Amino acid sequence: MIDSHVHVWSDDFERFPLAPGFNPGNLWLTRYTPEDILRESRPLGVTRLNLVQMTWYGLDHSYIADAIARNPGVLIGTGIVPAVTDVSGPSPDDAMVALSEQGIVAFRIRGRAARPALGDGPQWLDHPGYDKMFRCGHERNLALSFLILPEDIPELNRMCARFPGTPVIIDHLCGIGSKGPFPENEISALCGLARHPRVMVKIGAFYARGARKPPYLDSLGLVRRVVEAFGPDRCMWETDAPLTRPGSPETTPPHTYEASLALIRDHADFLSASDKEKILTKTAERLFFAR
């Protein structure tokens, strides 16, 4: 099986320094490496990981690139490329191509509702830099992975209509249920994105939605709606590990890696064995590893 979304970092600050402004006290844990995750995940059958660039490394992808190079076929990466910046840097599409050569094959974009205000209007993707990223994603089969909330859906819908060939991922079930309830209008809006054939959804981060208590059964209704709309071929399971983050009440124990897996593997009885194989392995394998 494949975990399509984990965060990792090292405590070797000399070799992999934190970005300016960050210090070791900012880290959720002293370290959280791919090896740490795999020690927990492999006994459960989860043997491959998508490493999502951690905030405190900024734009320096050295750590995940090094991990991927040391673990070919086991690790793959999602990076960060700024589409809009006030400093002189590479064109975002050129940066995407360069990073893809290091095994970083998806690129995270934060939605307007999921980041600090930048002074942009409702069409927050209306910028030549984002056009370049969408175009490059189509031409190179590099996914754009969106950390968004439901209010961001209309703008993403507009861009997916403009660039229908670009692979797009919605992280964390679009944040639905993060405030407790699972509003029908938000679920319908997310499911409406299924009209775009290259839009996929990461199903997970169950610790952060609904009652926020394992076994997370209150998330099953949302999972069912999303899988029915997108099909299991466009859904992939994630944990968003680490699941324990000191200072964050929503991620304190008893959240466990196995509980996140068990919701799909054991409790989603509306899914067939084939559906579960696609969600837990095949969708992520096809997008990230079968290149």
Which residue ranges define each predicted feature?
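Hydrophobic faces of well-ordered beta-strands that scaffold small-molecule active sites
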Residues: 2-6, 49-52, 76-79, 107-109, ...
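A generic "structured core" feature
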Residues: 1-2, 6-9, 123, 133, ...
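An N-terminally biased module of ancient metal coordination in phosphate/nucleic-acid-related enzymes
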Residues: 1-59, 258
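Active-site gating/metal-coordination segments in enzymes
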Residues: 58-151, 158, 200-206, 212-213
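H/E-rich (His + Asp/Glu) clusters that bind or coordinate divalent metals
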Residues: 177-179, 183-291
